[in-house]
Structure formats: structure tokens, C-alpha cells
A protein has these predicted regions:
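Terminal low-complexity tails and localization/encapsulation signals of metabolic enzymes
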Residues: 219, 236-238, 315-346
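Conserved Rossmann-fold dehydrogenase catalytic segment
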Residues: 124, 153-162, 184-200, 216, ...
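N-terminal helix-loop segment corresponding to the beta1-alpha1 unit
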Residues: 1-185, 287, 334-335
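Short Pro/Gly-enriched beta-strand edge/turn motifs at strand-loop
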Residues: 37-42, 213-220
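Aromatic-enriched alpha-helical interface/lid elements that frame and gate functional surfaces
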Residues: 231-307, 311
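Oxidoreductase and adenylate-handling cofactor-binding alpha/beta cores
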Residues: 142, 168-189, 202, 206-214, ...
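Glycine-rich beta-alpha junction loops
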Residues: 31, 121-123, 196-201, 239-241, ...
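Short, well-structured beta-strand/strand-turn elements
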Residues: 23-27, 305-319
């Protein structure tokens, strides 16, 4: 597999395929190479002259080489590599590879089984095909960012790149695997066109259901899954931490109400007619918030985590990294491997 991508979406897609067993060759331009080499780079990495953790994390498990695709010699090398490859993935702006003489039509003529994946912000064709953008722009156009708003209506800047990772990386992985299966069954290769904006839009199911049913997506704090019911909400604890209550189904809500010694709350549930975002729902949110505010996060976790009621702590990334759920020893080994990899590949 040839990985010509940079930044996050393409490298993450290639990483996931490498984890599944693909032999990935990362190809970078001479000089600075992939911008993530220095993006969020620590001072110790700069002093040591090695790429930052971001680069090492999303490019681990790959071989690496440099090619100048602006030179005929570099393009000839890539053509030779593509003639033997199963997959090529790139994230240039649409049209760049064609202008270099390295587009799908050219490369597939020499290798009809080639699966060629192009990840872009707005797709290989259409009115925005040549527009620049990043994750925030893509989820903005897709109607996703609007749904990540606080109660005052102000959208947040999420530190989880939804379009890059869901719209770009995971969509690329699934489509590449489907294309490879087609080839394995005797079919020809495929051009896989991944638009991060369109794939993000396609996954915005809940908002689109409300749009169909009611003519508008729910404002923050007014829908079933965005804070409009007490059984599916976030609550502040006495130590200024947060508890996630996901007791969406009645049986989980009933268990939670009994654990809180509030059995009378069990009938105040959306499935029993409580209006979502209505007066009773908002009142019960306030009542439950008062109860949760009486104890620390640790105390709530100790008393509720073992119960079958879908309640969990809101952990920081540092806490999550040490949680038994994620097998910290295995993750530490991965991190150590990334830290030990040098500039010549992982």
C-alpha cells in the first residue's frame, strides 16, 4: 500500500490498514515532508531532531521513503511502485495527481487491480472540489458543528476531529476494504472518492431525523440525545467533575432511580410520555443535578459503576490512558515503540 497522504485523515486510514496487516510505504516529499513532523512537537523532540509524537503516532508501523513528484525521475519511481501496489491513497487537492500524470486513469492502465483512494474535503468533483479546508470547515458545512453547541447556541471547537477521522479515515478504510474484496473476487480496481464533508453529512442521522419529522434539528438541550431529557445528560459533581448519565432505556433509568433512593422519578421518563425538552424534563434535570452535586465523582463511580444503569465518569485523556478498560501496559508499549522510531521509518 502506498500512502501519499499528509496530516491526519489519510495517515490515520493507512495506520488502521497497517494494523490490519497491510504493508504500508509512506511517501513524503523531500525537505520538510509531512507537516505533522513538527506539528505539536515537544521541545525534547526538537532538541533530539526527531519528528513529534503526532507524526510518530499516526505513522507507526509504516515503511518510509522520499520522492520528489515534481521531477520526472520521482514520478517514474511512483509509477513503478503503483504498478505493483494493491492500494494507493492520496490527499492532494483534486486535480493535482492528474496534472502530475499520476491520476487514477494513468496508474490503473498499468495496474488494472489498483484501488486508488483520494481523500479530499469536498470530493473529487462538484462546486467546492478545489476549495481548501480543514475539519472545522467540513463539519461546519455538514451541519454537524451546529449540533455541537452549548445551551447559549455557541458551537464549540471540538478537540476530536470528526470529519478527519470519521468522514475521512474510517470512511476511506471501509471503502478501500470493500474495493479490495471486489478485486479479490475477480473484479477490476476502483477509484475511491472520499469527501470528508459528504461522509460527515451522511452520518448526521439524529439531526436529519428531526429535520424530516419536525422541520428543524433540535437546539442544544431540547432533543432526546442532546440534553433535553434527565435520563441522558451530564451532571456536575461536588468536586467540579462531570458524571455522564446514559440511562436512555426505561430499565436503566429505573435502576438508577432506585440506586438514588428516588423511586418516584422512575415514571418520569420520555418513553412513558414525558415531553422531551418539556417543563417536567427540565425540572427533573435540575432535581437530579442537585442530587449529583452532593457527592464527588469518585463517590458516584464507586456506588453506581457496578450497577447496570449506564452511568460513567467523564474522564480526562490522562485518566483514560490509565483506565483498565484501555490496557495501559499495551498502550504504553505502543507509545514507547513510537518514541523509539527514528526519522527513517517505523
Amino acid at each position: 500500500m502506498l500512502d501519499l497522504t499528509r496530516l491526519l485523515p489519510g495517515p490515520a486510514a493507512a495506520l488502521r490498514l497497517a494494523e490490519l496487516g497491510a504493508d504500508v510505504l509512506k511517501i513524503e516529499a523531500p525537505g520538510a515532508g509531512d507537516p505533522t513532523r513538527t506539528m505539536m512537537q515537544s521541545s525534547s523532540d526538537r532538541v533530539a531532531g526527531r519528528p513529534g509524537a503526532f507524526y510518530r503516532m499516526v505513522n507507526r508501523g509504516k515503511r518510509e521513503t522520499r520522492l520528489d513528484l515534481k521531477s520526472e525521475a520521482g514520478r517514474n519511481v511512483l509509477r513503478a511502485l503503483a504498478a505493483e501496489a494493491d492500494v494507493l491513497i492520496e490527499s492532494f487537492r483534486p486535480g493535482v495527481m492528474e496534472r502530475l500524470g499520476l491520476g487514477y486513469a494513468t496508474l490503473s492502465a498499468a495496474n488494472p487491480r489498483l484501488v486508488y483512494c483520494a481523500i479530499s474535503g469536498y470530493g473529487a468533483s462538484g462546486p467546492f472540489a478545489d476549495h481548501a479546508g480543514h475539519d472545522l470547515n467540513y463539519i461546519g458545512y455538514a451541519g454537524v458543528l451546529d449540533q455541537l453547541a452549548s445551551r447559549d447556541g455557541a458551537p464549540i471547537v471540538p478537540n476530536f476531529q470528526i470529519a478527519d477521522l470519521l468522514g475521512g479515515a474510517l470512511s476511506a478504510v471501509t471503502q478501500i476494504l470493500a474495493a479490495l474484496w471486489h478485486v479479490a473476487r475477480g473484479g477490476a480496481g476502483r477509484f475511491v472518492d472520499v469527501s470528508m464533508t459528504h461522509t460527515s453529512y451522511a452520518h448526521n442521522f439524529v439531526a436529519q431525523v428531526s429535520l424530516l419529522n419536525e422541520g428543524a434539528a433540535p437546539a442544544a438541550g431540547s432533543g432526546l440525545l442532546n440534553g433535553g431529557v434527565p435520563c441522558y445528560n451530564l451532571y456536575r459533581t461536588s468536586d467540579e467533575r462531570w458524571l455522564a448519565v446514559g440511562a436512555l432505556e426505561l430499565k436503566f433509568w429505573e435502576t438508577l432511580c432506585m440506586a438514588l433512593d428516588r423511586p418516584e422519578w422512575a415514571t418520569r421518563h420520555w418513553s412513558l410520555g414525558q415531553a422531551i425538552g418539556g417543563p417536567d424534563a427540565l425540572a427533573l434535570i435540575r432535581e437530579l443535578a442537585e442530587v449529583i452535586a452532593t457527592r464527588t465523582l469518585g463517590e458516584w463511580v464507586e456506588s453506581l459503576e457496578s450497577l447496570d444503569c449506564c452511568v460513567s465518569p467523564v474522564l480526562t485523556p490522562a485518566e483514560a490512558a490509565q483506565h483498565p478498560l484501555f490496557n495501559p501496559h499495551a498502550y504504553a508499549a505502543v507509545a514507547a515503540s513510537a518514541a523509539d522510531s527514528d526519522d527513517d521509518g517505523a
